[in-house]
Amino acid sequence: MQFNLVFVVAVIGVGMVAADENLMSKLQMALKSMLNENEELQMQSRDTKGQCESDTNKCNNHGTCIEGRWGTYYCKCEMPFRVGIPDSSCYPPPEGKKDLEIEARDSENRCLSDTSNCDGHGICQLSTFGRNERYICFCALGFRNNNYGGCSPYTPREIEFLSYVARDLELEMLTRDSLGRCKSDTHNCDEAGQCVTKTYGRYAGEYICVCNHGYRNNAYGGCSPMTTREIEYLDMLAREEQMQMLVRKYYSLSECSQGTNDCNENGECVEEDGKYWCECGEGYEENEDGGCSPIVTRATEVDDDDFAERKKEIMRQLAEFLQEE
């Protein structure tokens, strides 16, 4: 009925455009108002269908009626039941669907606390990171979460990609270590770490706090306890860092051969878990060929300015060339 009235008003408005432009403008405003009211009615109807009542159980005894952010209520269904139509209550899954697929879609990679369904390659633990607490699989080294809530092995391409990501994590570790320096003659690690000499990176030879497990470097050079959320977040980062180590040591990115000079005389070929890799000496770092190269120092500000000017000149010449074309 509302759409018919809108159509009539629109037709009348079109016929009177030439007579009165002001009237046409008013008709357009009225038309927009009626359309907005119709959209609000549709949204209200849709939201009403998705609500349950807080004082009654309309979730078919297979879920809980929970109050949402805006004062509305909705059904949080138990596994493997799902919210269905027309009353948005909890219904069993359709026939012919695999339990594993239902679990993957409804639980979003969750595992069950009383079962071991991480494919034998992880541990099912309660996660508090994010908006909701839930059980998830913490996969072992070399495995990742899959679409079915378990753990699957990384592919070679995934491992190679993670190796590049982990190199940035090494820079993050250098930055964090430089903020947590200490003095050799004092104990200012807040009794939660050890003040040691740094043997790698830009700050090699300086003293830093190596904090105990569960602590982190603070802005005062000591060690402060991590929060639960920080520990869980760093645990996720550590898995990627472990993957990078796996790549460098087990996938020939940094392998060397014992008894040969594969480290360019600037490092030592060491053995770990049956694999060999280069441990570079002071002032050297690993290169893409698996050997050791001198650490490149940052260019001076004058060199940076000259490079910037040359870059601007090249861009200017390129722009002129494109205009001529």
Swiss-Prot record:
Signal sequence region: 1-17
Protein's UniProt keywords contain Repeat: yes
Pfam families in the cross-refs: EGF
PROSITE patterns referenced in this protein's UniProt entry, alphabetically: EGF_2 (PS01186), EGF_3 (PS50026)
Coiled coil: none
Domain EGF-like: 48-91, 107-152, 178-224, 252-293
Keyword Transit peptide set for record: no
Cross-referenced InterPro entries: EGF-like_dom, Nephronectin_domain
Disulfide bonds: 52-65, 59-75, 77-90, 111-124, 118-137, 139-151, 182-195, 189-209, 211-223, 256-269, 263-278, 280-292
Keywords: Disulfide bond, EGF-like domain, Repeat, Signal
Entries under PANTHER family matching the protein: PA14 DOMAIN-CONTAINING PROTEIN, UROMODULIN-LIKE
Protein name: Fibropellin-2
Gene: EGF2
